[in-house]
Amino acid sequence: MGRTLAVPTPYGCIGCKLPQPDYPPALIVFMFCAMVITIVVDLIGNSMVILAVSKNKKLRNSGNVFVVSLSVADMLVAIYPYPLMLHAMAIGGWDLSKLQCQMVGFITGLSVVGSIFNIMAIAINRYCYICHSLQYERIFSVRNTCIYLAVTWIMTVLAVLPNMYIGTIEYDPRTYTCIFNYVNNPAFAVTIVCIHFVLPLLIVGFCYVKIWTKVLAARDPAGQNPDNQLAEVRNFLTMFVIFLLFAVCWCPINALTVLVAVNPKEMAGKIPNWVYLAAYFIAYFNSCLNAVIYGVLNENFRREYWTIFHAMRHPVLFLSGLLTDVREMQEAQAHTHARARARTQAHEQDHAHACPAVEEIPMSVRNVPLPGHGAAGQPECVSGHPKPASGHSRSVSARRKSASAHPKSASGQSKSATVYPKPTSVHFKPSSVYFKADSVYFKPSSSHPKPITGPSKTAISPATSFPKPTTGYTQHATIHSEPTTLDYLEPITTSHSKPVIASHSELAASCHLECNIFDLSDPTSSPASDSSNSAASLLDPTAAAAATVNPTVVTTDYHEIVLIDVDADSDEMAV
């Protein structure tokens, strides 16, 4: 592995090999020991912070997520850059590759910028917790906290990456480490200091001033417990001291960077080398102080520290405790997921009860237009009858017993009696379908309706229940309809009056009546004759009532009415 080449500059010797540094040997030994202690305390202390937060349920909150993130940022420099610094101090120079020097500078930048950004996130979290307590749970929910943490580290990486291209990372013999050389680009150096140090400090200072003002305004010495006041003050002081120590430790090195960047020719030779060394080592020492501050000022952290110390004396118990904690965390997560699933199912059931599912319409009654819908584009009456002036008609019912579930048509083929009940019945409009009281009558001996031939109205005999043709005369004494169940009664018409079918479409009468009507047209009569005969019957109802029924008239035109009595307990049939 070759040595790094020397790069002399007018403002100092950066990258030069110094076999005999101008520091006293005692100072080098002291700094070497201080760095060893810093590395040990950094690794152990920040590891204990992470374990304490993971083991203590009281410490598992959104604010301590950024505390753990700050501990990770502090541990970065103790893992890689600090050991290489010890190596450079031991041999008096840098004998490693250029890539390793670049890695040292990049990881150091991540640690420093990550620390200040996490301290800023902690201050914002404390500010929202104290000054905006009502919105705290919504702002710092578990999901939002993870997003904020990811944004913090993304900002850290984006803030350090420009230094890899603009600022040159080189070995500095004054600090025994690889740093960013901003001497050749003073404007960039000032910008970096403002973004990485000054702006975060202003934000953190604003948050803690607001917090302190809120705490002082909320104090009530007469009605508040002094122990609670002391606990609030200690919780506030813990994070404030963390911020204050970071500002004190990193202020000297940032001030030197700005001074050298503003006036490099004059300031480069006036600043002694030991000032650079002291400034950098104070900044490096800050990485191990946070864990100590937590243990001194926070009772929960201090209690967990003692628990970890006692557990480390018995490694087997310590490992078993860790496994138990991991298992408890998994069980807690499984319980949380189960509760979430149960809550989701409860919401779905409530929604299902609130919005019941609509039953599917059976195939036998699908595509059947409801009354009033199919007549939108066609005339309502095809027989020439005037539209009744009354409102919705009620269904006319006749008492009959069902002897067969499958009535047969004239061709001998049985009709399907399968009926799919629906939660609600269909109510017909008076303009859709209505049968006249004098056109249908029944005989109680049989329940098998048969098609009726003839150009006149359909009549069902009470003796046989077989439809018989009528020749324009209705037998008034055989009418079994109940006029009290109708909203209106039409006069008795002549032989050419027909049931009114809206729009020539099929008719489905709820789930108790299925009517298949064929051959609506009458080849033996014309609409003109229908209209005239209907008018005559309307003018002379007594003549039609006195007429006799001629059962011998046979015609080729018929209307088929299939009656299905589904409900055995019902004594009525809707007409």
Curated annotation (Swiss-Prot):
Domain of life: Eukaryota
Disulphide connectivity of cysteines: C101-C178
Membrane topology: Multi-pass membrane protein
Record's keyword annotation contains Disulfide bond: yes
Main location: membrane
Compartment(s) of residence: Cell membrane
Chain ranges on the Cytoplasmic side, renumbered to this chain: 52-64, 125-143, 210-239, 295-575
Pfam family, one: 7tm_1
Ranges of biased composition (kind: Polar residues): 455-474
Extracellular face of the membrane: 1-30, 86-103, 165-188, 261-273
Cross-referenced SUPFAM superfamilies: Family A G protein-coupled receptor-like
GO cellular component, as recorded: plasma membrane
The keyword Ubl conjugation is annotated on this UniProt entry: no
Region annotation (Disordered) ranges: 368-421, 446-474
Any GO molecular function: melatonin receptor activity
Membrane-spanning residues: 31-51, 65-85, 104-124, 144-164, 189-209, 240-260, 274-294
Keywords, in A-Z order: Cell membrane, Disulfide bond, G-protein coupled receptor, Membrane, Receptor, Transducer, Transmembrane, Transmembrane helix
UniProt cross-references to PANTHER family, sorted A to Z: B2 BRADYKININ RECEPTOR/ANGIOTENSIN II RECEPTOR (PTHR24228), MELATONIN-RELATED RECEPTOR (PTHR24228:SF56)
Biological function: G protein-coupled receptor that plays a role in numerous physiological processes including regulation of energy metabolism, neurite outgrowth or cell migration. Promotes self-renewal and neuronal differentiation of neural progenitor cells through activation of the NOTCH and WNT/beta-catenin signaling pathways. Modulates the KAT5-dependent glucocorticoid receptor signaling by modulating KAT5 subcellular compartmentalisation.
Subunit structure, interactors included: Homodimer, and heterodimer with MTNR1A and MTNR1B. Interacts with KAT5. Interacts with RTN4 isoform A/NOGO-A. Interacts with TGFBR1.
Family: Belongs to the G-protein coupled receptor 1 family.
Protein name: Melatonin-related receptor
Species for this entry: Ovis aries (Sheep)
Gene designation per UniProt: GPR50
